[in-house]
């Protein structure tokens, strides 16, 4: 990687080339690559306004991209930082077509990233990523990419991969980026409403043009600006690939941030949470498999990928975030909680903790750090209930495991969890 100060001449040439491409070959995409289109993508009046100053949140998290292909052509795009915990690189999200030249079947040779008021940074193919679906088939549902910048950063947008569909209907949304039809290096913002959505796309009628591919598509949700999707395509309406659990998992894996972890009970310090997902190969309403306990040392059956599916921005004061617990032995199998009917604390616990294929709110948990340094897992669907482990009698390693893992109800879920509902996270 090298640090370069981007010259105005370089950017000007890229903008002129982008505008020329749009005149000779307009497409429905708004790519920063060959065939870039400046076709306005919403009907009616252009409501875009310039952002000034650009150095306060969330605007300081939005960057311009100068992209160079293997053919030596230069194009423009946008990107944005997201808040990811416990990673050793800075994550910049953009469109897959900003990092991978699908028609050339190769990654960009270099991308220069410039944030407002900051020195430009140039990275090469080893530090950029596009989804395998986009690389293999140009799949628009998976047209997302990642740029890895040097150094750690706790700065960035909040985001959600699990916002309920009912929250999207007619929701006001914002797009902000660096359009090619405006002065060099200027950021423009516009709002609109969501017109429809699918599991992988959000459609909307914001005015956008070429150069804005890879810019954040965000809304006010949960008390902060939250990115929901990556703006990538323009027509009437536009659409953007949604943030998904799979996307975040892949980003973390690319950043070496998806690490196996074991959950060791605080109350039973030699006992670990165990998951047997045998036969759990499709979604079924009651879930399946077995979640129980195992004596040390932990194996893959006691190992998990625990990663966020919704995060507050770096400036938020929240101490919890939503995660999934995916089995390392049985990929795509997640810890599930069903505490229907529980409305008070029960000595032996209650409800059921088992497995599910893929995820829903029953598989989402609030991860909270407890005062003793351990962690607790409170369910999103049942927000008064925590995962509980009873390891009595588990004093040797048995093949089917033993003990009980179930639920515990808290009248006030803000109070510290007991040691039976607390776990030490051990990274493998």
Predicted regions and their residues:
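C-terminal cap/linker of serine protease catalytic domains
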Residues: 1, 228-259
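Protease-domain processing segments flanking chymotrypsin-fold serine proteases, especially trypsin-like
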Residues: 1-86, 250-259
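Serine endopeptidase catalytic core focused on the charge-relay Asp
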Residues: 57-60, 67, 75-76, 88, ...
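A structural micro-motif recognizing beta-strand termini
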Residues: 66-70, 148-154, 205-210, 267, ...
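Short beta->alpha transition motifs characteristic of CBS
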Residues: 95-100, 210, 228-237
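Acidic glycine-/aspartate-rich tracts in secreted/extracellular proteins
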Residues: 98-100, 117-120, 151-154, 179-181, ...
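Extracellular glycan-recognition/adhesion modules and their associated mucin-like linkers
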Residues: 257-285, 300-345, 361-397, 415-428
């Amino acid at each position: 990687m090298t640090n370069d100060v981007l010259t105005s001449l370089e950017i000007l040439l890229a903008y002129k080339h982008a505008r020329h491409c749009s005149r000779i070959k307009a497409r429905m995409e708004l790519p920063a690559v060959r065939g870039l289109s400046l076709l306005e993508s919403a009907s009616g009046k252009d409501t875009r306004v310039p952002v000034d100053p650009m150095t306060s949140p969330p605007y300081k998290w939005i960057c311009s991209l100068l992209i160079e292909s293997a053919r030596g052509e230069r194009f423009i795009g946008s990107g944005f930082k997201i808040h990811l915990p416990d990673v050793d690189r800075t994550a910049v999200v953009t469109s897959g077509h900003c990092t991978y030249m699908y028609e050339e079947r190769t990654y960009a040779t270099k991308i220069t990233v410039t944030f407002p008021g900051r020195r430009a940074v140039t990275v090469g193919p080893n530090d950029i990523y596009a989804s395998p679906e986009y690389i293999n088939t140009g799949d628009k549902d998976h047209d997302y990419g990642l740029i890895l910048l040097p150094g750690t950063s706790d700065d960035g947008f909040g985001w959600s991969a699990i916002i309920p569909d009912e929250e999207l209907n007619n929701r006001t949304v914002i797009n902000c980026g660096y359009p090619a039809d405006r002065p060099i290096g200027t950021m423009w913002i516009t709002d609109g409403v969501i017109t429809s959505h699918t599991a992988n796309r959000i459609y909307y009628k914001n005015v956008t043009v070429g150069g804005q591919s890879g810019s954040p598509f965000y809304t006010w949700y949960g008390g902060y600006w939250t990115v929901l999707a990556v703006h990538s395509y323009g027509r009437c309406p536009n659409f953007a690939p949604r943030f998904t659990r799979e996307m975040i998992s892949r980003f973390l894996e690319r950043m070496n941030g998806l690490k196996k972890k074991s959950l060791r009970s605080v109350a039973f310090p030699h006992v670990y949470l165990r998951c047997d997902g045998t036969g759990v190969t499709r979604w079924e309403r009651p879930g399946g498999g077995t979640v129980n306990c195992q004596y040390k040392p932990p194996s893959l059956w006691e190992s998990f990928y625990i990663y966020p599916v919704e995060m507050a921005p770096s400036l938020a004061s929240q101490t919890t975030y939503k995660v999934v617990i995916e089995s390392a032995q049985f990929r795509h199998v997640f810890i599930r909680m069903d505490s229907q009917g529980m409305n008070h604390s029960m000595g032996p616990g209650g409800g059921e903790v088992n497995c599910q294929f893929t995820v829903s709110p029953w598989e989402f948990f609030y991860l909270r750090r407890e005062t003793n340094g351990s962690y607790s897992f409170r369910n999103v669907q049942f927000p008064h209930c925590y995962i509980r482990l009873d390891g009595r009698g588990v004093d040797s390693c048995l093949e089917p495991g033993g003990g009980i893992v179930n639920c515990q109800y808290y009248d006030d879920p803000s109070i510290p969890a007991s040691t039976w509902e607390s776990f030490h996270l051990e990274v493998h």
